[in-house]
């Protein structure tokens, strides 16, 4: 396995090991006599996933903390121990999937423009919430457009996601202290928007996607290939189990 996906809920961690699968394995055929063939950057990669491991995070684990976000080193140790339990101690690269309720988020509308301009708009929307402290946040955005229309003044909806830079730095340092590399922090909603644009067939119809796991309930609506609505709620799984 090459990577571990880490999802964080209030009382649980969900970790899943994964790896990219070679062309021969993905196609189910051997690539004999063609070992020097260059990879096609447009070719869709295939992945193999382990069974998820659910790690309880209770008061005994947190001690005087209210969540693992307050102790990145604890989060890293739990992931490290989880990989050992899964017999995947060889994994070093970590992808952290963050739910929107743990981020500062804001939807906004804009017309098509240069990437740097749209990024500036995203920062402005976050500034509406955090004021001048916006410079202390790392901000990314994901637009809902499929870029299949060419209207210059078409109004597009985007969503900005922000995390304190200091927290991101502490997370990197925390994982590094356990010989793990935090290579990416991804908002789960951004991943869902991307997936809907690429994989959900919604042309000439409206499609609703509802996902519930230990981390969140995610509601997503797409129409004619364009995402219309995306929102996350705290998962009720823990309350159901109680």
Listing of model-derived features with the role each one plays in the protein:
Residues 2-24, 42-43, 47-50, 152-242:
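Small-residue (GG/TT-enriched) beta-loop-alpha framework at ligand/catalytic clefts
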Residues 88-89, 130-137, 177-180:
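Short secondary-structure junctions
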Residues 24, 29-42, 47-49, 73, ...:
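Phosphate- and other anionic-substrate recognition elements at nucleic-acid/protein interfaces
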Residues 72-73, 98-158:
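Internal amphipathic helical hairpin motif
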Residues 37, 44-85, 241-242:
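N-terminal phosphate-binding loop and adjacent alpha-helix
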Residues 77-84, 120, 124-128, 169, ...:
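Solvent-exposed alpha-helical segments within well-ordered globular domains of core cellular machineries
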Residues 73-87, 191-192, 199-204:
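Phosphate-interacting basic helix/loop segments used at nucleotide- and nucleic-acid interfaces
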Residues 88-101, 175, 184:
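Short glycine-rich phosphate-binding loop at a beta-alpha junction
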């Amino acid at each position: 396995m090459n990577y571990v996906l880490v999802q964080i809920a209030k009382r649980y961690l969900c970790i899943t090991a994964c790896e990219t699968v070679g062309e021969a394995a993905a196609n189910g055929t051997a690539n004999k006599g063609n070992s020097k063939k260059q990879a096609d950057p447009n070719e869709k990669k295939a992945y193999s996933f382990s069974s998820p491991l659910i790690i309880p995070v209770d008061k005994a684990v947190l001690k005087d903390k209210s969540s693992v976000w307050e102790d990145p080193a604890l989060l890293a140790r739990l992931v490290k121990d989880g990989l050992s339990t899964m017999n995947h101690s060889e994994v070093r690269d970590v992808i952290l999937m963050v739910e929107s309720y743990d981020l500062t988020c804001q939807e906004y509308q804009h017309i098509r423009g240069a990437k740097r301009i749209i990024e500036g708009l995203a920062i402005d929307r976050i500034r509406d919430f955090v004021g001048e402290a916006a410079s202390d946040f790392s901000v990314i955005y994901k637009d809902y457009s499929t870029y299949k229309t060419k209207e210059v003044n078409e109004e597009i909806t985007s969503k900005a996601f922000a995390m304190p830079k200091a927290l991101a730095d502490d997370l990197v340092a925390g994982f590094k202290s356990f010989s793990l590399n935090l290579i990416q922090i991804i908002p789960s909603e951004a991943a869902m928007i991307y997936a809907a644009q690429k994989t959900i067939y919604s042309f000439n119809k409206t499609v609703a996607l509802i996902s519930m796991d230990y981390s969140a309930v995610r509601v997503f609506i797409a129409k004619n290939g364009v995402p219309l609505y995306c929102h996350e709620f705290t998962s009720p799984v823990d309350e159901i189990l109680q």
